[in-house]
C-alpha cells in the first residue's frame, strides 16, 4: 500500500486506523497495523489546488489531532513532542496556506503538521473526536475537520480541570494564558480562516444534542480524553459550541 495525500489534515498516510460508514450512518473506527501504508509520498505541491475552505478545514483537523493527542491521558512523551511540534508548525503556517495556496513553505509545513498529528495520535484522541465522529454520521454530512474546529474550544476548556499544565502548554503556543483565553484564540483562528462560528451555522440544532451525546459515549476516543465526560458534559459542550 502506497499513500499519496492530497490534503493536509487527516494524516492517514501514516496511521493505522480506518473508518467504515455503516448502513445506518454510524461511523465505526478500527485499528490494524496492516492498514499502515508501506510508503507515504508527501508532496506539498499536490495540495496547491486545494480550495481555501477545504485547506482551512483540513488544517484545523491537523490542529485538533495535535492538541488532543498532547492532552490525551496516555503517557507517551515522544508522541507529545511530535504533536507539540506539529501544532507549532500548523499555527505558524495555516493562515498563509489559506491565503496563499501555492506558497510551498506554508503547504510543506501544513503537510508535516498533518503527518505529525497522525503519527502521534496512535496515543489516543479525545472528546472532540468522540463528538465529531457522532456528528459526522448525520444525514447532512458535516465536514469532519470543520466539526473539529468548532468543537475544539469548548473541549479544551472542559479538559483544563484535569490537565491544567498541558492546557497551558498548548495556550503558550497560541501566546495566551489559561483555557478560557485559549478557547477564545481558537475561535478567533476559526473566524480568520472563514470557518463557521458554531454548530448552528452547520445546520446542527439543540434537538440533536442528546442523541449525539449518547453516541459520543460509545466512541473509541471517549476513553482517552483526559477528563472523562458524562452524557450531560457532552450536551453542555455541544450547547457551548452552538
State each model region's role.
Residues 1-77, 166-169:
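A glycine/threonine-rich phosphate-anchoring loop and its flanking beta-alpha core
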Residues 9, 115-145, 219-224:
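Glycine-rich phosphate/pyrophosphate-binding beta-alpha loops
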Residues 55-60, 79, 83, 141-146:
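Short glycine/threonine-rich catalytic loop with a Thr-x-Gly-x-Asp
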Residues 63-67, 110-117, 131, 152, ...:
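Short alpha-helical scaffolding segments that buttress acidic/His motifs in well-ordered protein cores
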Residues 68-122, 133-137:
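Glycine-rich phosphate/diphosphate-binding loops and the adjacent beta-loop-alpha structural elements
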Residues 138-141, 145-208:
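Gly/Pro-rich interdomain helix-loop hinge
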Amino acid at each position: 500500500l502506497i499513500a499519496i495525500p492530497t490534503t493536509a489534515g487527516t494524516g492517514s498516510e501514516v496511521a493505522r486506523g480506518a473508518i467504515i460508514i455503516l448502513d445506518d450512518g454510524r461511523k465505526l473506527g478500527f485499528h490494524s497495523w496492516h492498514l499502515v501504508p508501506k510508503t507515504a509520498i508527501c508532496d506539498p505541491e499536490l495540495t496547491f489546488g486545494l480550495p481555501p475552505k477545504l485547506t482551512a478545514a483540513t488544517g484545523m483537523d491537523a490542529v485538533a489531532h495535535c492538541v488532543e493527542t498532547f492532552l490525551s491521558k496516555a503517557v507517551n512523551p515522544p508522541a507529545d513532542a511530535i504533536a507539540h511540534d506539529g501544532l507549532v508548525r500548523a499555527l505558524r503556517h495555516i493562515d498563509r496556506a489559506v491565503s496563499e495556496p501555492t506558497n510551498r513553505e506554508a503547504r510543506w509545513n501544513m503537510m508535516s503538521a498533518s503527518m505529525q498529528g497522525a503519527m502521534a495520535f496512535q496515543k489516543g484522541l479525545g472528546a472532540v473526536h468522540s463528538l465529531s465522529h457522532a456528528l459526522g454520521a448525520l444525514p447532512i454530512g458535516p465536514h469532519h475537520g470543520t466539526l473539529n474546529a468548532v468543537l475544539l474550544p469548548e473541549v479544551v476548556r472542559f479538559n483544563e480541570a484535569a490537565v491544567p499544565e498541558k492546557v497551558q502548554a498548548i495556550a503558550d503556543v497560541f501566546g495566551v494564558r489559561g483555557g478560557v483565553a485559549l478557547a477564545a484564540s481558537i475561535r478567533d483562528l476559526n473566524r480568520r480562516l472563514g470557518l463557521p462560528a458554531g454548530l448552528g451555522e452547520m445546520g446542527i440544532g439543540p434537538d440533536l444534542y442528546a442523541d449525539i451525546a449518547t453516541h459520543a459515549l460509545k466512541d473509541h476516543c471517549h476513553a482517552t480524553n483526559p477528563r472523562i465526560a458524562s452524557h450531560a458534559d457532552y450536551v453542555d459542550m455541544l450547547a457551548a459550541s452552538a
